Amino acid sequence: MINILILSAGTRDKVVQYFKEALAGKGKVIATDCSPYAPAIYEADEYVLVPRITEPGYLDKILEICREKQITGVLSLIDPELSLLADNKERFLEVGTVPIVPDAKQVDICFHKYAMYEACKALGFATGRCFLDRKEFYHAVENGELTYPVFVKPESGSASLDIHMAQDQETVEFLCGREDGLMIQEFMNGQEYGADVYIDMLSGEVVSIFVKKKLKMRAGETDKAESFQEEKLFALITDFVKKMGFRGIIDIDLFEIDGNWYISEVNPRFGGGYP
């Protein structure tokens, strides 16, 4: 039997349904959430109401569920929980459950945008320039290396929260003066794409890639899109995934500008386009 535990299922009904279809007759899907009003939990074979992720004892409760329900693999649909799974990988393995996330190092890089920028540069993958130091950014502008507008955003975070576009130095100064932990990112003036990539947890080999051309966004997630296929892009994604050492499920944001591909961000989970 293959039993899958989906944490923080929320409103992601289809994700739960897809797992049930794939496991029909082979295992069960168990879902959790902190609210009895989360519709997706009622799509699962079984569900368990749990404390909020921030409450003491949350991890112990999840481990208890894994042990009692003989869970084969566990995954989460929300960002704050991914680090919890990755950081406690050994504890899950001790009860016979595989956390379906990349290793803690890769998860940490994904959640820190400047770290991802540096990783892309080090591995030779094109990406928009990022700056933590305003003086370094202003110097680059003066040298004609990039132009306004630019994005000012938190160096860590998700769901496109607190992202602002700055058209000039005055706006950059104002935004960066309001709070700490911000970075300046080059504006990528091109078509945005999203890639859902599935990587074997053991071998690290890419199992499947699905690319979508983004047509409409909602709170940083894809709302409307159309499928897209290009061998050059698929080869780039496969190379990137292997060199980064990813495992499990990842969602890559990319831009196409004048026929060239740029990697923007990586989310180590199902993309928001999955309802």
Q: Which sequence ranges carry the predicted segments?
A:
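ATP-binding N-terminal substructure of ATP-dependent carboxylate-amine bond-forming enzymes
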Residues: M1-I100
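Short, charged, surface-exposed secondary-structure boundary motifs
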Residues: A40-Y42, G57-D60, D108-H112, S160-I163, ...
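Active-site nucleotide/adenylate-binding loops and adjacent lid/helix of ATP-dependent enzymes
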Residues: V107-N189, M201-S203, E231, A235
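Phosphate-binding site of ATP-dependent enzymes
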Residues: I163-F240, M244-G245, F255-E256, N260-Y262
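A short acidic/small-residue loop/turn micro-motif
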Residues: K214-L215, R269-G271
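ATP-dependent carboxylate-activation loops
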Residues: E226-S227, F270-P275
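Flexible, glycine/charged-enriched surface loops at secondary-structure junctions
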Residues: I249-D253
